[in-house]
UniProtKB/Swiss-Prot annotation:
Cofactor(s) listed in the protein's UniProt record: Mg(2+); K(+)
Gene that produces this protein: metK
Protein name in the entry: S-adenosylmethionine synthase
Region feature (Flexible loop): 99-109
Organism classification: Bacteria, Bacillati, Actinomycetota, Actinomycetes, Mycobacteriales
Function in brief: Catalyzes the formation of S-adenosylmethionine (AdoMet) from methionine and ATP. The overall synthetic reaction is composed of two sequential steps, AdoMet formation and the subsequent tripolyphosphate hydrolysis which occurs prior to release of AdoMet from the enzyme.
């Protein structure tokens, strides 16, 4: 039997890029909390001893950004310069301007409304940018996610938990996980081939001790909790800090930037990506809201039994409410004609930006919790785009 190896990775909240995502989304949440109609595009850069926040916003309230930055860093665990970064003493610079009036006008008054015709309320708000967004779902896991990224995220979350709960001492915030799975010709996972964990740690920690601790307190519990013990055999390769010592990490080890972990944030490379990042963007930006909607669509299609795997693409033009394109792909696993599935999607889901924002209730401060460990398949969170609330509607639309 032919085995094909597929790999996905995740990173912890102390990874430099994820620090930036967390800061950007914390600022977004704070602005939505004081003004749900805020338009926000915030980028963060971190480097040794410094945090730089830049972007464009429109918000009718006030947010104390430097304090928010420092609190986010403390929550992650950067508490001392001894570990390379101190949230209390690092430099914080803020350079945020007002959103472009031209962009704001296109979002507030869509092309359909500007044409002078009578339009519905949901036709009045245009997409915040052009672009294409993808959503994906598969029935290979209970959370409808590809197993490699699901396991990588579980390992990363557990790695952070054992650090914060002091189950494994001497760990520091920065870390990465990676999982390689073997798939058969029917695209079913048959065994876990390789697990890689790299974690920042205090000086003087031996690699042998670290491997024993992480095997016992991270890998074994995750495998059991995920219910994939049957995929583990004697040929499993486990690599713990394969580069050796990892004392210098976080922003001291590498500069970080918002939006550089878009594959970690989505499906681990198992599905296509439109290129737009999520963090620091309010839901008028379809990079974020439409990608969430596409996950909602794909997950409900698979849960309805219409396909075993599903990828959905949508595309928008800036300032226009209605999508310019919709494409459904089921990789030969469809149980109904793809044309019928796509027609059902168009009947059941309203993909105009204003409708997406309303149906998923996206003008809320819910985004900082998604900044690390993935935006999809989160069994630890109640996220509106993960709800299976259109399954019956899709089935009914197909049967008509």
């Amino acid at each position: 039997m032919t085995q094909r190896l597929f790999t996905s990775e995740s990173v912890t909240e102390g990874h430099p890029d994820k620090i930036c995502d967390a800061i950007s989304d914390s600022i977004l949440d704070a602005m939505l909390a004081v003004d749900p109609d805020s338009h926000v595009a915030v980028e963060t850069v971190v480097t040794t001893g410094q945090v730089h926040v830049v972007g464009e916003v429109r918000c009718r309230g006030y947010v104390e950004i430097p304090s928010l930055v420092r609190q986010t860093l403390r929550n992650i665990g950067f508490l001392s310069s001894d570990m390379g970064f101190d949230g209390a003493t690092c430099g914080v610079s803020v350079s945020i301007g007002e959103q472009s009036l031209e962009i704001g006008a296109g979002v507030d008054t869509a092309l359909e409304a500007r044409d002078g015709a009578e339009v519905e309320d949901d036709d009045r708000a245009g997409a915040g940018d052009q672009g294409l967004m993808f959503g994906y779902a598969t029935n290979e896991t209970p959370e409808y996610m590809p197993l490699p990224i699901a396991l990588a995220h579980r390992l990363a979350r557990r790695l952070t938990a054992v650090r914060k709960d002091d189950i494994v001492p001497h760990l520091r915030p920065d870390g990465k996980t990676q999982v390689t799975l073997a798939y058969n010709d029917d695209n079913n996972p048959i065994r876990i081939d390789t697990i890689v964990i790299s974690t920042q740690h205090d000086p003087g920690v031996s690699r042998q001790w670290l491997e024993e601790q992480l095997r016992t307190n991270v890998i074994t519990p995750v495998i059991k909790d995920a219910g994939v013990e049957n995929l583990v055999d004697d040929e499993l390769t486990v690599l713990i800090n394969p580069s050796g010592s990892f004392v210098v990490g976080g922003p001291m080890g590498d500069a970080g930037l918002t939006g550089r972990k878009i594959i970690v944030d989505t499906y681990g490379g198992m599905a296509r990506h439109g290129g737009g990042a999520f963090s620091g963007k309010d839901p008028s930006k379809v990079d974020r809201s439409a990608a969430y909607a596409m996950r909602w669509v794909a997950k409900n299609i698979v849960a309805a039994g219409l396909a075993d795997r599903c990828e959905v693409q949508v595309a928008y033009a800036i300032g226009r409410a209605n999508p310019v394109g919709l494409y459904v792909e089921t990789f030969g696993t469809e149980k109904e004609p793809i044309s019928a599935i796509q027609e059902a999607v168009q009947k059941v889901f309203d993909l105009r930006p204003a409708a997406i924002i309303r149906e998923l209730d996206l003008k809320r401060p819910i985004y900082a919790q998604t900044a690390a460990y993935g935006h999809f398949g989160r069994t630890d969170l109640d996220l509106p785009w993960e709800r299976l609330d259109r399954v019956d509607d899709l089935k009914a639309a197909i049967s008509r």
